[in-house]
Protein backbone atom coordinates (compact mmCIF):
# COMPACT_ATOMS: atom_id res chain seq x y z
CA UNK A 1 0.00 0.00 0.00
CA UNK A 2 1.24 3.47 -0.88
CA UNK A 3 -1.32 5.76 0.79
CA UNK A 4 -3.10 6.13 4.13
CA UNK A 5 -6.49 7.81 4.49
CA UNK A 6 -7.97 8.82 7.84
CA UNK A 7 -11.75 9.28 7.83
CA UNK A 8 -13.19 10.83 10.98
CA UNK A 9 -16.90 11.42 11.45
CA UNK A 10 -17.85 13.93 14.12
CA UNK A 11 -20.21 12.72 16.88
CA UNK A 12 -20.60 9.17 15.52
CA UNK A 13 -22.04 6.79 18.08
CA UNK A 14 -20.75 3.26 17.91
CA UNK A 15 -24.18 1.64 18.28
CA UNK A 16 -25.68 3.10 15.08
CA UNK A 17 -23.30 1.23 12.76
CA UNK A 18 -24.53 -2.07 11.38
CA UNK A 19 -21.28 -3.84 12.21
CA UNK A 20 -21.67 -2.76 15.85
CA UNK A 21 -25.34 -3.70 16.14
CA UNK A 22 -27.08 -0.71 14.51
CA UNK A 23 -28.98 -0.58 11.25
CA UNK A 24 -28.30 2.64 9.38
CA UNK A 25 -25.09 2.01 7.42
CA UNK A 26 -25.67 -0.37 4.48
CA UNK A 27 -22.63 0.81 2.52
CA UNK A 28 -20.26 0.61 5.46
CA UNK A 29 -21.65 -2.83 6.27
CA UNK A 30 -20.97 -3.93 2.68
CA UNK A 31 -17.20 -3.40 2.98
CA UNK A 32 -16.73 -5.09 6.35
CA UNK A 33 -15.05 -8.14 4.81
CA UNK A 34 -12.11 -5.88 3.98
CA UNK A 35 -11.86 -4.43 7.48
CA UNK A 36 -10.26 -5.03 10.84
CA UNK A 37 -12.90 -4.02 13.38
CA UNK A 38 -11.86 -2.91 16.86
CA UNK A 39 -14.66 -3.66 19.32
CA UNK A 40 -13.06 -2.08 22.39
CA UNK A 41 -11.78 1.25 21.06
CA UNK A 42 -11.90 4.32 23.28
CA UNK A 43 -11.53 8.02 22.59
CA UNK A 44 -9.15 10.19 24.60
CA UNK A 45 -11.98 12.63 25.32
CA UNK A 46 -15.72 13.32 24.95
CA UNK A 47 -15.55 16.38 22.69
CA UNK A 48 -13.51 17.59 19.72
CA UNK A 49 -10.50 19.29 21.35
CA UNK A 50 -9.97 16.52 23.90
CA UNK A 51 -10.39 13.79 21.28
CA UNK A 52 -8.32 15.15 18.39
CA UNK A 53 -5.19 15.60 20.47
CA UNK A 54 -5.24 11.81 20.59
CA UNK A 55 -6.27 11.23 16.96
CA UNK A 56 -3.76 13.62 15.36
CA UNK A 57 -0.96 14.09 17.94
CA UNK A 58 -1.01 10.84 19.97
CA UNK A 59 -1.09 12.83 23.20
CA UNK A 60 -3.59 13.73 25.92
CA UNK A 61 -5.59 16.94 26.16
CA UNK A 62 -4.43 18.28 29.55
CA UNK A 63 -0.71 17.55 29.28
CA UNK A 64 0.14 21.18 28.58
CA UNK A 65 -2.60 22.85 30.58
CA UNK A 66 -6.02 24.12 29.57
CA UNK A 67 -4.86 25.52 26.25
CA UNK A 68 -7.22 26.46 23.44
CA UNK A 69 -4.39 26.73 20.92
CA UNK A 70 -2.57 23.57 19.87
CA UNK A 71 0.65 23.57 21.88
CA UNK A 72 3.93 23.71 19.96
CA UNK A 73 5.09 20.91 22.24
CA UNK A 74 2.70 18.55 20.47
CA UNK A 75 3.69 16.90 17.20
CA UNK A 76 0.99 16.48 14.57
CA UNK A 77 1.06 13.35 12.42
CA UNK A 78 1.12 15.70 9.41
CA UNK A 79 4.42 17.19 10.60
CA UNK A 80 6.00 13.75 10.88
CA UNK A 81 4.85 12.71 7.42
CA UNK A 82 5.77 16.01 5.78
CA UNK A 83 9.35 15.61 7.00
CA UNK A 84 9.36 12.12 5.49
CA UNK A 85 8.42 13.53 2.07
CA UNK A 86 4.84 12.25 2.08
CA UNK A 87 2.14 14.55 0.69
CA UNK A 88 -0.26 15.60 3.48
CA UNK A 89 -3.77 16.85 2.81
CA UNK A 90 -6.69 17.58 5.14
CA UNK A 91 -10.32 18.62 4.55
CA UNK A 92 -12.76 19.47 7.34
CA UNK A 93 -15.19 22.10 8.65
CA UNK A 94 -14.71 22.19 12.42
CA UNK A 95 -13.58 25.48 14.03
CA UNK A 96 -12.06 23.71 17.05
CA UNK A 97 -9.34 22.14 14.89
CA UNK A 98 -8.79 25.07 12.55
CA UNK A 99 -5.82 27.04 11.24
CA UNK A 100 -6.66 29.75 13.76
CA UNK A 101 -5.95 27.31 16.62
CA UNK A 102 -2.76 25.90 15.11
CA UNK A 103 -3.95 22.62 13.58
CA UNK A 104 -2.63 23.48 10.10
CA UNK A 105 1.00 22.60 10.85
CA UNK A 106 2.64 20.15 8.48
CA UNK A 107 -0.09 20.07 5.84
CA UNK A 108 0.62 20.65 2.15
CA UNK A 109 -3.11 21.31 1.71
CA UNK A 110 -5.34 22.20 4.67
CA UNK A 111 -8.97 23.20 4.16
CA UNK A 112 -10.97 24.10 7.28
CA UNK A 113 -13.83 26.12 5.70
CA UNK A 114 -13.22 29.05 8.04
CA UNK A 115 -13.10 31.48 5.12
CA UNK A 116 -16.30 30.17 3.55
CA UNK A 117 -19.91 31.01 4.22
CA UNK A 118 -21.91 28.34 6.02
CA UNK A 119 -25.64 27.98 6.55
CA UNK A 120 -27.47 29.93 9.22
CA UNK A 121 -28.97 26.78 10.73
CA UNK A 122 -26.17 24.32 9.90
CA UNK A 123 -22.83 26.02 10.66
CA UNK A 124 -20.52 23.73 8.72
CA UNK A 125 -19.73 22.51 5.21
CA UNK A 126 -21.51 19.22 4.54
CA UNK A 127 -19.88 15.94 3.53
CA UNK A 128 -20.95 16.08 -0.11
CA UNK A 129 -19.08 19.38 -0.51
CA UNK A 130 -16.04 17.99 1.33
CA UNK A 131 -16.13 15.05 -1.10
CA UNK A 132 -16.15 17.42 -4.07
CA UNK A 133 -13.08 19.16 -2.72
CA UNK A 134 -11.31 15.83 -2.19
CA UNK A 135 -12.17 14.79 -5.75
CA UNK A 136 -10.80 18.05 -7.12
CA UNK A 137 -7.57 17.60 -5.17
CA UNK A 138 -7.14 13.99 -6.30
CA UNK A 139 -7.75 14.98 -9.92
CA UNK A 140 -4.70 17.24 -9.74
CA UNK A 141 -2.56 14.94 -7.57
CA UNK A 142 -3.08 11.76 -9.59
CA UNK A 143 -1.50 11.94 -13.03
CA UNK A 144 -1.78 9.13 -15.60
CA UNK A 145 -3.14 6.83 -12.90
CA UNK A 146 -0.19 7.28 -10.54
CA UNK A 147 0.70 9.67 -7.75
CA UNK A 148 3.19 10.40 -5.02
CA UNK A 149 2.33 8.59 -1.73
CA UNK A 150 -0.10 10.66 0.30
CA UNK A 151 -1.81 10.94 3.67
CA UNK A 152 -5.36 12.24 3.35
CA UNK A 153 -7.47 13.22 6.36
CA UNK A 154 -11.18 13.85 5.84
CA UNK A 155 -13.56 14.88 8.63
CA UNK A 156 -17.35 14.98 8.19
CA UNK A 157 -19.51 17.24 10.37
CA UNK A 158 -23.00 16.21 9.21
CA UNK A 159 -23.80 14.21 12.37
CA UNK A 160 -23.16 17.21 14.59
CA UNK A 161 -26.12 19.10 16.01
CA UNK A 162 -28.44 20.87 15.20
CA UNK A 163 -29.75 17.68 13.48
CA UNK A 164 -31.47 18.95 10.33
CA UNK A 165 -31.22 16.02 7.88
CA UNK A 166 -32.64 15.90 4.36
CA UNK A 167 -36.22 14.69 4.07
CA UNK A 168 -35.31 11.50 2.19
CA UNK A 169 -33.17 10.29 5.09
CA UNK A 170 -35.87 11.03 7.65
CA UNK A 171 -38.21 8.87 5.56
CA UNK A 172 -35.77 5.95 5.81
CA UNK A 173 -35.67 6.17 9.62
CA UNK A 174 -39.31 7.09 10.31
CA UNK A 175 -41.61 8.18 7.45
CA UNK A 176 -44.25 9.25 9.98
CA UNK A 177 -41.93 11.97 11.30
CA UNK A 178 -43.15 15.07 9.46
CA UNK A 179 -41.10 18.17 10.38
CA UNK A 180 -39.99 21.28 8.54
CA UNK A 181 -36.44 22.60 8.84
CA UNK A 182 -37.74 25.40 11.06
CA UNK A 183 -39.40 22.87 13.37
CA UNK A 184 -36.20 20.82 13.59
CA UNK A 185 -34.19 23.93 14.40
CA UNK A 186 -36.70 24.97 17.05
CA UNK A 187 -36.41 21.51 18.63
CA UNK A 188 -32.65 21.98 18.70
CA UNK A 189 -32.95 25.35 20.46
CA UNK A 190 -35.70 24.36 22.89
CA UNK A 191 -34.46 20.90 23.87
CA UNK A 192 -30.88 20.16 22.87
CA UNK A 193 -29.31 23.53 23.61
CA UNK A 194 -31.05 23.63 26.99
CA UNK A 195 -30.05 20.00 27.70
CA UNK A 196 -33.70 19.38 28.57
CA UNK A 197 -34.42 15.65 28.79
CA UNK A 198 -37.70 16.00 30.70
CA UNK A 199 -39.80 15.06 27.65
CA UNK A 200 -38.61 11.65 26.47
CA UNK A 201 -40.73 11.93 23.34
CA UNK A 202 -38.87 15.03 22.16
CA UNK A 203 -35.52 13.42 22.99
CA UNK A 204 -36.54 10.42 20.89
CA UNK A 205 -37.32 12.73 17.96
CA UNK A 206 -33.81 14.18 18.28
CA UNK A 207 -32.40 10.66 18.21
CA UNK A 208 -34.34 9.83 15.05
CA UNK A 209 -33.08 12.98 13.33
CA UNK A 210 -29.56 12.00 14.35
CA UNK A 211 -30.05 8.51 12.89
CA UNK A 212 -31.27 10.07 9.64
CA UNK A 213 -27.95 11.92 9.50
CA UNK A 214 -26.15 8.59 10.03
CA UNK A 215 -27.85 7.24 6.91
CA UNK A 216 -26.85 10.43 5.10
CA UNK A 217 -23.24 9.97 6.17
CA UNK A 218 -23.32 6.39 4.90
CA UNK A 219 -24.22 7.70 1.45
CA UNK A 220 -21.37 10.21 1.69
CA UNK A 221 -18.98 7.36 2.52
CA UNK A 222 -20.22 5.43 -0.50
CA UNK A 223 -19.55 8.47 -2.69
CA UNK A 224 -16.12 8.94 -1.11
CA UNK A 225 -15.04 5.36 -1.81
CA UNK A 226 -16.40 5.79 -5.33
CA UNK A 227 -14.15 8.82 -5.79
CA UNK A 228 -11.13 6.83 -4.61
CA UNK A 229 -11.95 4.08 -7.11
CA UNK A 230 -12.53 6.56 -9.93
CA UNK A 231 -9.14 8.17 -9.26
CA UNK A 232 -7.48 4.73 -9.13
CA UNK A 233 -6.14 5.11 -5.58
CA UNK A 234 -8.40 2.89 -3.44
CA UNK A 235 -6.52 -0.29 -4.38
CA UNK A 236 -3.32 1.31 -3.05
CA UNK A 237 -4.74 2.82 0.15
CA UNK A 238 -5.35 1.87 3.75
CA UNK A 239 -8.43 3.62 5.17
CA UNK A 240 -8.78 4.17 8.94
CA UNK A 241 -12.32 5.12 10.01
CA UNK A 242 -13.30 6.41 13.43
CA UNK A 243 -14.91 9.32 15.29
CA UNK A 244 -13.84 11.90 17.83
CA UNK A 245 -16.71 11.07 20.21
CA UNK A 246 -20.37 10.06 20.32
CA UNK A 247 -23.52 11.92 21.34
CA UNK A 248 -25.79 11.46 24.35
CA UNK A 249 -29.56 11.09 24.21
CA UNK A 250 -30.46 11.14 27.88
CA UNK A 251 -28.54 8.03 28.95
CA UNK A 252 -26.92 9.97 31.79
CA UNK A 253 -29.26 12.92 32.11
CA UNK A 254 -28.01 15.04 29.24
CA UNK A 255 -27.74 15.64 25.51
CA UNK A 256 -24.98 16.33 22.99
CA UNK A 257 -21.37 15.78 24.13
CA UNK A 258 -20.48 17.67 27.28
CA UNK A 259 -17.68 16.75 29.66
CA UNK A 260 -18.82 13.25 30.58
CA UNK A 261 -16.91 10.00 30.27
CA UNK A 262 -19.65 7.43 29.74
CA UNK A 263 -19.63 4.85 26.96
CA UNK A 264 -22.08 6.63 24.65
CA UNK A 265 -19.43 9.35 24.30
CA UNK A 266 -16.04 7.63 24.59
CA UNK A 267 -16.55 4.00 23.48
CA UNK A 268 -16.11 4.59 19.76
CA UNK A 269 -16.12 2.74 16.43
CA UNK A 270 -12.73 2.10 14.86
CA UNK A 271 -11.93 0.06 11.78
CA UNK A 272 -9.10 -0.27 9.28
CA UNK A 273 -9.95 -0.99 5.64
CA UNK A 274 -7.43 -2.98 3.61
CA UNK A 275 -8.40 -3.38 -0.08
CA UNK A 276 -6.76 -6.81 -0.46
CA UNK A 277 -8.41 -8.28 2.64
CA UNK A 278 -11.05 -10.97 2.00
CA UNK A 279 -12.49 -11.68 5.44
CA UNK A 280 -13.38 -9.39 8.32
CA UNK A 281 -11.09 -9.56 11.33
CA UNK A 282 -12.29 -8.70 14.83
CA UNK A 283 -10.06 -7.33 17.60
CA UNK A 284 -11.42 -7.39 21.15
CA UNK A 285 -8.33 -5.93 22.84
CA UNK A 286 -8.66 -2.54 24.56
CA UNK A 287 -7.26 0.14 22.23
CA UNK A 288 -7.32 3.93 22.08
CA UNK A 289 -7.60 6.59 19.39
CA UNK A 290 -4.21 7.76 20.69
CA UNK A 291 -2.87 4.74 18.77
CA UNK A 292 -3.89 6.15 15.38
CA UNK A 293 -0.78 8.31 14.65
CA UNK A 294 1.66 5.46 15.48
CA UNK A 295 -0.41 3.18 13.25
CA UNK A 296 -0.15 5.64 10.35
CA UNK A 297 3.61 5.86 10.89
CA UNK A 298 3.80 2.04 10.81
CA UNK A 299 1.74 1.79 7.62
CA UNK A 300 4.12 4.17 5.86
CA UNK A 301 7.09 2.10 7.01
CA UNK A 302 8.62 4.93 9.06
CA UNK A 303 10.50 4.74 12.34
CA UNK A 304 8.39 5.09 15.53
CA UNK A 305 8.01 8.66 16.83
CA UNK A 306 9.16 9.04 20.44
CA UNK A 307 6.75 11.95 21.05
CA UNK A 308 3.77 9.70 20.38
CA UNK A 309 2.27 8.03 23.45
CA UNK A 310 0.17 5.48 21.62
CA UNK A 311 1.20 2.17 20.12
CA UNK A 312 0.68 1.00 16.54
CA UNK A 313 -2.47 -1.08 16.20
CA UNK A 314 -0.67 -3.20 13.63
CA UNK A 315 0.42 -5.88 13.60
CA UNK A 316 -2.32 -6.98 15.98
CA UNK A 317 -0.08 -9.65 17.49
CA UNK A 318 2.34 -6.99 18.75
CA UNK A 319 -0.21 -4.74 20.45
CA UNK A 320 0.31 -4.64 24.25
CA UNK A 321 -2.43 -5.48 26.72
CA UNK A 322 -2.96 -2.29 28.73
CA UNK A 323 -5.57 0.13 30.05
CA UNK A 324 -6.89 3.22 28.26
CA UNK A 325 -7.21 6.81 29.50
CA UNK A 326 -9.25 9.87 28.66
CA UNK A 327 -9.36 13.42 30.02
CA UNK A 328 -11.21 16.68 29.43
CA UNK A 329 -12.64 19.72 31.13
CA UNK A 330 -16.04 19.16 32.71
CA UNK A 331 -18.13 21.92 31.13
CA UNK A 332 -21.23 21.26 33.20
CA UNK A 333 -21.99 24.26 35.34
CA UNK A 334 -19.19 26.36 33.85
CA UNK A 335 -21.75 28.81 32.44
CA UNK A 336 -22.84 29.51 36.02
CA UNK A 337 -19.50 30.16 37.71
CA UNK A 338 -17.18 30.57 34.73
CA UNK A 339 -14.95 27.74 35.94
CA UNK A 340 -14.19 24.44 34.24
CA UNK A 341 -12.93 21.45 36.19
CA UNK A 342 -11.06 18.33 35.13
CA UNK A 343 -12.69 15.00 34.45
CA UNK A 344 -10.78 11.76 33.82
CA UNK A 345 -11.46 8.11 33.10
CA UNK A 346 -9.40 4.94 33.04
CA UNK A 347 -10.51 1.54 31.79
CA UNK A 348 -8.71 -1.72 32.50
CA UNK A 349 -10.18 -5.10 31.57
CA UNK A 350 -13.88 -4.98 32.57
CA UNK A 351 -13.61 -2.04 34.97
CA UNK A 352 -13.82 1.68 34.31
CA UNK A 353 -13.23 4.45 36.81
CA UNK A 354 -14.20 8.13 36.45
CA UNK A 355 -12.95 11.08 38.50
CA UNK A 356 -14.68 14.49 38.63
CA UNK A 357 -12.70 17.36 40.07
CA UNK A 358 -15.83 19.51 40.38
CA UNK A 359 -17.09 17.58 43.40
CA UNK A 360 -14.00 15.42 44.05
CA UNK A 361 -16.02 12.30 43.29
CA UNK A 362 -15.23 8.84 41.94
CA UNK A 363 -17.35 6.38 39.99
CA UNK A 364 -16.50 2.74 39.24
CA UNK A 365 -18.36 0.43 36.88
CA UNK A 366 -18.08 -3.24 36.04
CA UNK A 367 -18.82 -3.03 32.31
CA UNK A 368 -19.22 -6.79 31.96
CA UNK A 369 -22.36 -6.80 34.11
CA UNK A 370 -23.27 -3.10 33.82
CA UNK A 371 -22.45 -1.92 30.27
CA UNK A 372 -24.78 1.10 30.57
CA UNK A 373 -22.84 2.38 33.61
CA UNK A 374 -25.80 2.70 35.95
CA UNK A 375 -24.55 1.04 39.17
CA UNK A 376 -21.61 2.92 40.74
CA UNK A 377 -19.68 0.34 42.80
CA UNK A 378 -16.89 2.61 44.06
CA UNK A 379 -17.87 1.98 47.69
CA UNK A 380 -16.70 -1.41 48.85
CA UNK A 381 -15.32 -2.68 45.55
CA UNK A 382 -12.01 -4.56 45.91
CA UNK A 383 -10.87 -3.03 42.58
CA UNK A 384 -11.53 0.57 43.64
CA UNK A 385 -8.20 1.48 45.24
CA UNK A 386 -6.04 -0.04 42.51
CA UNK A 387 -8.06 1.75 39.83
CA UNK A 388 -7.73 5.06 41.72
CA UNK A 389 -3.97 4.60 41.91
CA UNK A 390 -3.79 4.27 38.12
CA UNK A 391 -5.65 7.55 37.64
CA UNK A 392 -4.36 9.76 40.48
CA UNK A 393 -0.99 10.68 38.86
CA UNK A 394 -2.86 12.22 35.92
CA UNK A 395 -5.12 14.51 37.95
CA UNK A 396 -4.02 18.18 37.90
CA UNK A 397 -0.61 17.03 36.65
CA UNK A 398 -0.12 20.12 34.47
CA UNK A 399 -0.30 22.24 37.64
CA UNK A 400 2.52 20.32 39.33
Describe the residue ranges of each PLM region.
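Catalytic domains that recognize anionic headgroups
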Residues: 1-400
Amino acid sequence: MRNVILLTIDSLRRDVLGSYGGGFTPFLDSIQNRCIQFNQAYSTGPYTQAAFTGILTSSYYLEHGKQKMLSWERVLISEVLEKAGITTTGFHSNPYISTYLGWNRGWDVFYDSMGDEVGEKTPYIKAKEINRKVDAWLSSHVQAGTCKPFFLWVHYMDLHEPYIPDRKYINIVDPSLQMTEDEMFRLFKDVLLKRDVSDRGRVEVLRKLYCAHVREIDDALKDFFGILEKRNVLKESWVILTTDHGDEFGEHGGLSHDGKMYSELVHVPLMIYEPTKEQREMCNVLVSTIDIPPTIVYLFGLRPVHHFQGHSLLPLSDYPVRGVFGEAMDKQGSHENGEEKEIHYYRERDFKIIYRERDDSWELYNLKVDPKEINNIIEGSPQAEAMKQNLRPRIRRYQK
